[in-house]
Amino acid sequence: MSDKPNNFPPLPRFIPLKPCFYQDFDTDIPDLHRTTAKRLYYLWMLNSITLGVNLIGCLAWLIGGGSATNFGLAFLWLILFTPCSYVCWFRPIYKAFKTDSSFNFMAFFFTFTAQLVISIIQAVGIPGWGVCGWIASISFFGTNVGSAVVMLIPTIMFTAVAVLSFVALTKVHRFYRGAGGSLSKAQEEWTTGAWKNPHVQQAAQNAAFGATQGAMTQNEPQYSATPNYGYSNEM
């Protein structure tokens, strides 16, 4: 087990709560996967920001004559989905890249697919569901144009999150299958308990780092001897 103190989320000192997770892309994630892991983290941040903007959009919806139910649900989605999405799909893919764990990859695919479906529903925007999607925003133009324009901002952001989520899911799945991952490997990890064994995880992490360094070494030009370019010594 790592003795490093938890550093995420970075809470102010006056809050009587401590960080729950340790997160360091440079030390935990191999170079080969670091960019993808960071992009998924940025996607989680974009999704969280979108939920906050959606709350503002639902407030404009309420001021323009909409239902208070939408504002209440928007607040609920913000405080519920922000931490749950981090725990349910970002942490599994973070640990999957860190330890090359098939079980965590499968956990990510399952929860992130649900995240994708939710993002599509949010982009559609069914009235009364607490989201400013396309249906809710466009239909409200006949009631209050100003509020509808504000509602379009989270609508566009929800659409972007849905598109980026689909791209991310496709990319990670292509990598996983290309690396030889399968459901049977995930089931084997679950049966043997390797997915939660810290010693196995550390060994897998070391192997992943070693494989990455080996691939980088192979890509470097190799010279059997100092090259001689035949320059003349005559002046």
UniProtKB/Swiss-Prot annotation:
The chain crosses the membrane at residues 40-60, 68-88, 103-125, 149-169. Keywords: Cell membrane, Cytoplasmic vesicle, Endosome, Exocytosis, Golgi apparatus, Membrane, Protein transport, Synapse, Transmembrane, Transmembrane helix, Transport. It comes from the Eukaryota. It is a multi-pass membrane protein. Residues 1-39, 89-102, 170-235 are cytoplasmic. Residues 61-67, 126-148 are extracellular. It is found in: Cell membrane; Golgi apparatus membrane; Golgi apparatus, trans-Golgi network membrane; Recycling endosome membrane. One of its GO terms (cellular component) is synaptic vesicle membrane. Its main location: membrane. GO terms for biological process: exocytosis; positive regulation of calcium ion-dependent exocytosis; positive regulation of cytokine production; protein transport. The keyword Cytoplasm does not apply. Required for the calcium-dependent exocytosis of signal sequence-containing cytokines. Probably acts in cooperation with the SNARE machinery. Belongs to the SCAMP family. SCAMP5 subfamily. This is Secretory carrier-associated membrane protein 5A.
